[in-house]
Structure formats: structure tokens, C-alpha cells
Regions:
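Glycine-rich flexible loops
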Residues: 1-205
């Protein structure tokens, strides 16, 4: 498990370098491959560019049943990860980042709407390979009551289980995959697609 957490820390460092997880924002998690009911998620307040496997991740059972060690604060958004892992057994890793263009596009599209992507070659990185495929990524309202946010993200994720992401209005994106690498690929792809969406639909002329 230490090796997987070290790999997840590498994702955090890469996101920080790109400016996608600044000011301790965001959270990352990975499911335990030895026990599908267990996952590890970043603790609250940690610098995402300097994560360490032995220090910055908390173990949880589905349902958030296990206690948090004294002196360590869990991320309030752990509940979002918990609900996604419970709903989708094939999900192996979840990444929540505040990448700039995705966050901007989430505001421009607005909560309760769908971000429609078509005719972009890059939707293949999200698993859509068919000619004429259309990807509809849900955008949910940013509830400050985190359990409500978790419910909103989980409900939106069920709209089309093929779509490995949900945007939160003004609050970045949750993306997932069957592995850390897959989740990171989806994060990177969505930021590229958001940049293209900005240029094509929203950039002032």
C-alpha cells in the first residue's frame, strides 16, 4: 500500500506544480487493492506538493466507520469519495482538483447543467471511442453543506456511469478511474477540454 500512496503523492506534486492544487486545496484517494471496502484519502490541510505516504493519508472503511488518529483532521470532503467508492465498485482512485479552466467552465455552465463535449478527439481519453459520441459531464451546485455536496455528486455520477467525472460550480472537478493513472489522465484531459471549450464557446471576441 505504501507504494500506491507514494504514487498518489506524485500526482499531488504534479497537480501542485501545474497550479491545480494550490493553498492545500483538493483531495486525493485510492482504494485498497487488498480490501475493496477500504480506501486512503489525503488528510485536511496538507501541502499537496509535499505529500508523504506515511504521514498525509488517512485510512477509511466504506461508511467512514474507522476513527481518525488524534491530532489529524480528515478532509470534510472525504464523504464525497466514500459515496463514489460505495456506488462504483470498479473505481480505484478519485482526484479532486481546482484546475483553472475546469473551474472557470464550471462557473460558465452553472450548477444543474451538463457540459457537452463532442467532435473533440480527446474525449477518447475519457473512454468514448465511438464515431459521433457525445460526452455530457454533469455540473452540480456547490453546496457548502458537505454531505449535501456528496449526495449531489453521487447522484450526478449516476446519470451516465460511463462519464468518469462531475464538475462542481466554482469548485473544480471530481474525476475517477480504475487506477491512479486513469484518474490523473481524466483530470488532465478534462482541463484540456475545458481550455478548448473556453476558446470555442466563451472567450470574448
Amino acid at each position: 500500500m505504501t507504494e500506491l500512496l507514494a504514487r498518489l503523492a506524485e500526482s499531488g506534486a504534479e497537480y501542485y506544480r501545474r497550479g491545480w492544487m494550490l493553498a492545500t486545496a483538493g483531495n486525493l484517494s485510492v482504494r485498497d487493492p487488498e480490501d475493496a471496502s477500504r480506501y486512503f484519502v489525503t488528510a485536511s490541510g496538507g501541502h499537496k506538493g509535499r505529500l508523504r505516504a506515511e504521514r498525509d493519508f488517512l485510512r477509511f472503511e466504506l461508511g467512514m466507520q474507522n476513527p481518525v488518529p488524534q491530532g489529524v483532521k480528515s478532509s470534510a470532503e472525504t464523504i464525497v469519495h466514500d459515496l463514489i467508492y460505495a456506488r462504483f465498485p470498479d473505481v480505484g482512485s478519485i482526484h479532486h482538483v481546482h484546475s483553472p479552466k475546469v473551474t472557470l467552465v464550471s462557473r460558465l455552465i452553472g450548477g444543474g447543467n451538463l457540459w457537452e463535449l463532442k467532435d473533440f478527439e480527446y474525449i477518447k481519453a475519457l473512454g468514448f471511442w465511438g464515431e459521433g459520441d457525445v460526452v455530457r459531464v454533469p455540473v452540480v451546485v456547490n453546496h457548502h453543506h458537505i454531505p449535501s455536496l456528496g449526495d449531489a455528486v453521487e447522484r450526478a455520477a449516476r446519470l451516465d456511469a460511463r462519464v468518469p467525472a462531475v464538475l462542481v460550480d466554482g469548485h473544480g472537478v471530481y474525476a475517477w478511474g480504475d487506477s491512479i493513472d486513469a484518474a490523473q489522465r481524466h483530470i488532465e484531459d478534462l482541463e484540456f477540454l475545458a481550455d478548448m471549450t473556453w476558446e470555442e464557446r466563451f472567450r470574448p471576441r
